[in-house]
Structures are given as C-alpha cells and as structure tokens.
C-alpha cells in the first residue's frame, strides 16, 4: 500500500535524509540527492539525527505491537477454549502466559538451576559456566555474580530466611554463601567422591543435604561444615534431593529409576517409589493447598478413599510426571504430554496447578484436578532445564541450555 505524505512531511523527510547523508560522510550521494530533491544546503539543527531517532522509534513500536499481538492471540484462544478470562480469574488461578516479561542473558553456558529468593525481589541462576548470577526479577536487572566453583554449578538452595545460599558443583564441593552483606563464600565442604548434583536446606536452617553421582546423600552441619550423616541405598547417580516443609522427611530421585523417601533423624529409607521406566530427573513436594485437587484427580483411578499425603511429584526421562502419596507408596496419577525428558517441576502456591520444564523446549501448566495440560508455553530455543514458581508474587522463572533465564508473569 502506497503511503501518501503531505508536502511538508516530504520536505522534512528529505531534510532528515540529507542530514543523515552529510553527517555520515556520503558527500557524492548528498550532492546528487540535494539536486534531485531540491533540498537547501543549509540544514536546520532540528533535523540533526532525526532519521536515526525515527528508525529506533519504529523498531520500539514494532516490538510493542508484536507483544500486544501475542497477548491478543492468547486472549482469543482463551475465549474459544472457554477458559476464565483475566478479569474472572482469581490470583489462585493465575498461570504463566506468553510472551516472557524478561529474557536475561549473561551466562556463557547452559543454565542448570533457577530459584527465587524467599523474601527479596531477587532470583538466582546457576550455570555450567561455574558461576552463580543474581538478578532482580521485577526489573530484569543483573545484580552480581558469585564465583568460586571451578566446574559446573549443579544446584542452588536458600535457607528459609534467605540469609544463606548453598551451591553444589561438579568440582565435588558444596559451598555456603553469605547472602546478607558480603555475598562471599563462608564455607566449602568436601566429602563426595563424584559430581554433587543437588543441595537442599532443612527447614530449621542448621543442616544442608547434598546428593551425588557417588550414589550417596550426605547431611552437613552449617555451623561447622562437618558431614554428620551419610544415607545409602540408591544404586545409581542421585539426581535431586528435596526436603518436606515439616522437616522430618526428605525425598531423593535417581538414575536407578526410583524415588526414595527418607527419615531425617535416622538413616532409614521410609519408602521406595517405583513406576518410572527411566532416570527420574526431578521431584517437588506438593503444598498442603494441592491436597484437595490431587485427591479429586485420584478419585477416578483409586477407589480407596481419601489420601492423607504428603504428596510428591516426580519428572522422568520416560517423559511422564507422576504424583505420589508417600505415606502409602502409591502412584495416584500420571501426567502425559511432554515429548522429551521432564527436567523441572514446581507447584502453584494455590495448589491447583503444577508447572513442568522439559527437553522438548516447553513449559507446561497442568490442571491437577482434571489431570490435563491446560497450557503449553514454547519457552526456549533449547532444552528447558529448570523452573520455579514464586510463593507470593505472580512470577515463574525458567532456565535453559540456550543460556537464557526467562521471567514469566502470571495473569
């Protein structure tokens, strides 16, 4: 479609082009253009840099238009599918929606873990580049890097107050970082014989648990840095350790296709969960708020009455997500939909939904009550490796092999 400019607009555009040619040293072109466009040799100051300003404005507007179009497509889809629209959704129904609010770059290798700070508006990313980076998730600003590991940082975890950060690495060490003032490493613990793949604080904050490729889980005293307990039982690499909020039990998952739930105060395995057909990559404890949705979903499959829990979700290389009642060692439901390994899980604080990250490059939102995938976000250019859901603010973060960390707003 031909755009029609008024005489004045045409003259101003010609002046701006002449200014651009002159200021960038295109003398011959400028002379020819002045003759053909009848532009005076005395360029006014107001035309200085005007063409560049207009060009950058167009690019900014184009980006805004694309974002609005994505949101409009999203809204139209919801109307067609009959999902509650934004005005009708309560905060308990808010889920991550495209496009991402921020795409954060700075790491020089794959992202291995992303987590929110429990109190401040900060998030932390760990990477195979051996660094940990701190970001402000509300502004998308980079804050600082924590350096000290000499190999891939595999996992990070905060204590309940967010005063200490624990990290573990393929360099066989676990480090504790002061997250209040100095942001320096205050302790380094050694004891594992192979890659340390996961780390978690117990709720009281006085102990840290670590899981390793050496097939063991170790408990470390924060005050002294000493290993006080070693749990054995897995037959292969222990991928992840996660502590239940009450602090009396914790769960681990492994390349041996099993999940084990352990008693914190002894070295005993309370229950072994078997049903996955491949390596179990990730686990997540369900909040109390999820109990009713899980029970309702399980009701169709299990005619055994009300399940007490606690409930645990697991994601595997067999592409499935399973929800377990660990008190009886029973798999209550299986969620199918991912086309590749499931690498990360996080429950919605309201308990209705579970979000998952996968090597199929997507984030999926699962409606637990109806046992279905209600939204798929094509999140990254490469495998999605980690995901976290903020407990108080409407944000989800994801990390990927594409070296980016993305912040998703929930609405």
From Swiss-Prot:
GO terms for molecular function: dynein complex binding. SUPFAM superfamilies: Lissencephaly-1 protein (Lis-1, PAF-AH alpha) N-terminal domain, WD40 repeat-like. GO terms for biological process: border follicle cell migration; centrosome localization; centrosome separation; chorion-containing eggshell pattern formation; clathrin-dependent endocytosis involved in vitellogenesis; dendrite morphogenesis; establishment of mitotic spindle orientation; germarium-derived cystoblast division. It comes from the Eukaryota. It holds the Pfam family LisH_PAC1. It is found in: Cytoplasm, Cytoskeleton; Cytoplasm, Cytoskeleton, Microtubule organizing center, Centrosome. GO terms for cellular component: axon cytoplasm; cell cortex; dendrite; dynactin complex; dynein complex; growth cone; kinetochore; kinetochore microtubule. Residues 9-41 form the LisH domain. WD repeats lie at residues 106-147, 148-187, 191-230, 233-272, 275-334, 337-376, 379-411. Positively regulates the activity of the minus-end directed microtubule motor protein dynein. May enhance dynein-mediated microtubule sliding by targeting dynein to the microtubule plus end. Required for several dynein- and microtubule-dependent processes. Dimerization mediated by the LisH domain may be required to activate dynein. This is Lissencephaly-1 homolog.
